[in-house]
Structure formats: structure tokens, C-alpha cells
């Protein structure tokens, strides 16, 4: 009977890597986000920074899954580039410093946070990972002029998010 009960469960793709030397490895997860603890953890984490990105936690996770990215990566980059969306060019919704290389001071403007998350996620997949970047440090040399420093800061926020535990009752997920 247990087998019959398990047949209807959603499947998940999880790629594991050996533990040694994986501090900056890009891990991929694909899970249904409707009841996903990652969404709740990210939402609480962003709220702890009073981030305008808080309401888009589900978008971060869904776009990460869609593009086979570590679900923490795009949020961590926003932490480095804009203090999680709090310091951006007015009206740009560009919390990632995306497109600053174009010569404009404020880079690309997105219509909203969701569009920014989607475009940055897809861009990281196509322009970094699909072109051989295997970890945040590989990405850093393409993404930022100060590659290793940038990557270390992104890694810091990935690690903080990974270990984050909501402590306020309002931040704890409740299931009935």
C-alpha cells in the first residue's frame, strides 16, 4: 500500500556532488514550489533584510528550477549588488547590476522584480553556466571586474541563506 501512496507524489531532480571542494559548486534542484520550504526560507531571509524582493521569493525559486540554478544564487547576487534590491537606480528593478557594461550608469531597466529575476536567471544559465562556468568563482570573472572578491561576497550570502533559520514566530512556516 505504501507503494500506491508514493505513486502520486511529485518527483524531484537533485544532483549531488562529493563534499570535498564543493563550497562554491553550483547545485541544481527541481521541486514543486507550491509547498516548497525553500520559498518560505527565502521569503523569511529577505524579510530579515527588509528587502523589496521579499514578495518574489517564489519567483526566485521557480526561475532557479526552470534554469537549473542553485535556488540561492540570484538572491545572493542581489545581496551583493544592491543590498537585496534596496539600493538600485530609481525605477529600474535592477538589483543585480545587470547590463551596467553598456556604459549607462544604471544598466538594464526591468518592468518589475519578477521580470528581473527571470531575465537574470536565464542569463546566468545561458551566458555563464552553459559556457563553462562551474562555480561562483568562474562566474565572478565574467560578471564583475573584481572576480574573486565578488564571488566571495556572493558565496557569503549563499552560505547565510543555506544556514538561515527563521526565529520569529511570524517567519516560521505553519502546516495544518
PLM regions with names:
Residues 1-19, 103-176:
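Non-catalytic cell-wall polysaccharide-engagement segments
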Residues 2-39, 45:
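Extended, non-globular alpha-helical segments
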Residues 10-15, 43-62, 84-94:
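Short, charge-rich amphipathic segments
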Residues 17-25, 55-69, 96-104, 139-143, ...:
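Charged, low-complexity, helix/coiled-coil-prone segments
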Residues 27-74, 161:
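Export/targeting segments at the very N-terminus of extracytoplasmic proteins
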Residues 30-46, 79-133:
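Peptidoglycan-targeting cell-wall enzymes and recognition modules
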Residues 55-56, 72-73, 93, 131-134:
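Alpha-helix N-cap and coil->helix boundary residues
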Residues 66, 83-84, 145-146:
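A short structural micro-motif
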Amino acid at each position: 500500500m505504501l507503494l500506491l501512496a508514493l505513486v502520486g507524489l511529485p518527483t524531484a531532480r537533485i544532483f549531488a556532488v562529493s563534499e570535498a571542494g564543493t563550497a562554491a559548486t553550483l547545485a541544481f534542484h527541481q521541486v514543486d514550489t507550491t509547498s516548497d520550504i525553500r520559498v518560505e526560507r527565502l521569503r523569511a531571509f529577505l524579510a530579515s533584510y527588509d528587502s523589496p524582493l521579499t514578495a518574489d521569493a517564489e519567483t526566485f525559486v521557480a526561475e532557479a528550477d526552470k534554469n537549473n540554478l542553485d535556488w540561492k544564487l540570484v538572491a545572493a547576487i542581489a545581496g551583493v549588488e544592491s543590498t537585496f534590491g534596496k539600493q538600485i537606480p530609481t525605477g529600474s528593478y535592477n538589483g543585480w547590476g545587470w547590463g551596467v557594461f553598456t556604459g549607462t550608469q544604471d544598466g538594464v531597466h526591468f518592468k518589475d522584480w519578477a521580470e528581473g529575476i527571470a531575465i537574470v536567471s536565464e542569463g546566468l544559465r545561458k551566458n555563464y553556466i552553459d559556457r563553462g562556468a562551474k562555480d561562483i568563482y568562474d562566474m565572478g570573472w565574467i560578471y564583475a571586474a573584481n572576480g574573486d572578491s565578488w564571488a566571495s561576497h556572493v558565496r557569503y550570502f549563499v552560505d547565510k541563506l543555506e544556514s538561515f533559520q527563521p526565529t520569529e514566530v511570524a517567519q516560521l512556516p505553519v502546516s495544518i
